[in-house]
Regions:
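Conserved "HGTGT" condensation-loop signature of ketosynthase/thiolase-family condensing enzymes
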Residues: 1-78, 102
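Conserved catalytic cysteine-centered active-site region
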Residues: 38-57, 84-134
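Short glycine-rich or small-residue beta-strand-to-loop segments that form or flank ligand, phosphate
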Residues: 78-84
Length: 134
């Protein structure tokens, strides 16, 4: 009997920009306060990209970290899906930029834009690709 392939997460990679923008920083150029922002959003600070950084450059670093964690190389990649609500451009997709940066040639690469739920959709799509052997 044929056992279907099962998807599993075998490596993790993450990165955030080093530059931090606090509510106090925002108070300097907007008519607002730390308390007002905190009360409505719960946010104290956020990480923002610096010159030369983008969704793709950060994604490439995260992908390399995930590959290292899984003890894999870009040659082991069969599919690249990027879930983002902040692509740096419409074309080429962020996934294709990361694919190029990794040197992962000849594999499908595409973006999913579904805001906060994008990760769940990307995980589901990736799982179906794996389970169907495509």
């Amino acid at each position: 009997m044929h056992r279907p392939l099962r998807a599993a997460i075998i490596g993790l990679g993450a990165v955030v920009p080093e530059k931090v923008l606090t509510n106090a920083d925002i108070e300097k150029f907007l008519d607002t306060s730390d308390g007002w922002i905190m009360q409505r959003t719960g946010i104290r600070q956020r990480h923002v990209v610096s010159e030369g950084q983008s969704t793709a450059t950060l994604g490439t670093i995260a992908a390399k970290n995930a590959l290292a964690d899984a003890k894999l190389t870009p040659r082991d990649i069969d599919l690249i899906i990027v879930a983002t609500a902040s692509p740096e451009m419409l074309l080429p997709s962020t996934a294709c930029c990361i694919q190029n940066d990794l040197g992962a040639k000849d594999v499908p690469a595409f973006d999913i834009g579904a805001a906060c739920s994008g990760f769940i959709y990307a995980l589901s799509v990736a799982s179906k690709f794996i389970e169907t052997g495509t």
